[in-house]
């Protein structure tokens, strides 16, 4: 799914410029992506479209997020640290963080990594046309690189 999201971010200016899901699915298939990866990405995009009514305002970085047992069992400590960092840097709101965590909890446990969390964060911010501080954006974009080579065509 990470590579599909990276492809979308590289090839479309924003969420609104993407073709309808059926056409996008065919386009991604023609680009050589796996059908299951395409389906998972389209599902995530649908969730984002349906959650567009939240506030994109940065949260008070002093707020404390308590993770449930299920979340602590599934989310690596590094991912929880990334979520706190993004809140502290005012890169995401509390609502956006919750959407990211919700999305991560629907991914198989062995696929939940810091890079996956970064890419899902980028997808969410891209969908909301959010501006990012340069250093935070660079940190998130690093997840789209594999061995210093772009994962996108």
Swiss-Prot record:
Gene (UniProt): smg
Going by the entry's taxonomy, the superkingdom of the source organism is recorded as Bacteria
- The name of this protein is Protein Smg homolog
Query: What is stated as this protein's family in its record?
Result: Belongs to the Smg family.
Which Pfam families is this protein grouped with?
Answer: DUF494
Which PANTHER family does the UniProt entry name for this protein? PROTEIN SMG
The family database entries (HAMAP family) matched by this protein are listed as:
Smg (MF_00598)
């Amino acid at each position: 799914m990470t590579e599909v999201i990276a492809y979308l971010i590289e090839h479309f200016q924003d969420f609104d410029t993407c073709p309808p899901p059926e056409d996008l699915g065919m386009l991604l298939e023609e680009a050589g992506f796996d059908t299951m990866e395409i389906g998972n990405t389209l599902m995530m995009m649908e969730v984002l479209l349906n959650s567009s009514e939240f506030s994109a305002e940065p949260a008070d970085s002093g707020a404390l997020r308590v993770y449930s047992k299920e979340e602590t069992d599934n989310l690596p400590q590094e991912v929880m640290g990334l979520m706190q960092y993004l809140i502290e840097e005012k890169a995401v709101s509390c609502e956006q963080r919750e959407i990211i965590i919700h999305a991560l909890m629907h991914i198989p446990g062995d696929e939940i990594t810091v890079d996956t969390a970064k890419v899902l964060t980028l997808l969410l911010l891209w969908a909301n046309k959010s501006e990012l501080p340069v250093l935070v954006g660079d940190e998130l974009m690093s997840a789209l690189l594999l061995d210093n080579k772009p994962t996108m065509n």
